[in-house]
UniProtKB/Swiss-Prot annotation:
This is Transcription factor E. One of its GO terms (biological process) is regulation of DNA-templated transcription. It comes from the Archaea. The gene is tfe. The winged helix domain is involved in binding to DNA in the preinitiation complex. Belongs to the TFE family. The keyword DNA-binding applies. Transcription factor that plays a role in the activation of archaeal genes transcribed by RNA polymerase. Facilitates transcription initiation by enhancing TATA-box recognition by TATA-box-binding protein (Tbp), and transcription factor B (Tfb) and RNA polymerase recruitment. Not absolutely required for transcription in vitro, but particularly important in cases where Tbp or Tfb function is not optimal. It dynamically alters the nucleic acid-binding properties of RNA polymerases by stabilizing the initiation complex and destabilizing elongation complexes.
């Protein structure tokens, strides 16, 4: 979802009992404070975390708490959203003919190639037909994996 850095933040939060202070997070995991704060905000935007302030003596702490009770719903929603995007991409791959530049490797739809007289607009090479059956196979496989997982948890 957000890469290795977000994974590092989440694992630290989980290992810390589901709650961390923003003020110490960056130092604890070896990350810049502003970078950690940005990841915390992204995770909060997805409702994976919630924010709360607390006081310790005269200091105000910014606490981030894992939304354990909502994680399943969040993951189901994310899986469905991912499946929908993959279905859109699969439809695009199945309903277009592609050509590829043998020199730079850029890929074009038939319409794009036609507009450029079947020459690569970057280097002038003659475009060749491109077989996207492997992309289609991978997309179908991933869609099936997600659908099977959603069925397994009763959320298809």
């Amino acid at each position: 979802m957000y890469g290795e850095k977000a994974k590092k933040v989440l694992l630290h939060i989980i290992r810390s009992g589901g709650i961390v202070a923003e003020e110490t997070l960056g130092k604890d995991i070896g990350m810049k404070s502003n970078e950690a704060r940005k990841i915390l905000q992204q995770l909060a935007d997805e409702a994976i975390l919630r924010y709360k302030t607390g006081r310790v003596g005269d200091k105000t702490l910014h606490l981030w708490i894992l939304n354990i009770d909502q994680i399943e719903g969040i993951l189901i929603a994310r899986l469905k959203k991912t499946r929908e995007k993959l279905l859109i991409r699969l439809n695009y791959e199945k309903n277009n003919t592609f050509l590829k530049c043998p020199l730079c490797g850029r890929r074009y739809t038939f319409d794009e190639a036609f507009e450029n007289d079947f020459l690569c607009p970057y280097d002038g090479e003659q475009l060749i037909e491109y077989d996207n059956s492997e992309e289609i196979r991978i997309l179908e496989e991933k869609i099936k994996e997600i659908t099977d997982e959603l069925s397994r948890i009763g959320a298809a």
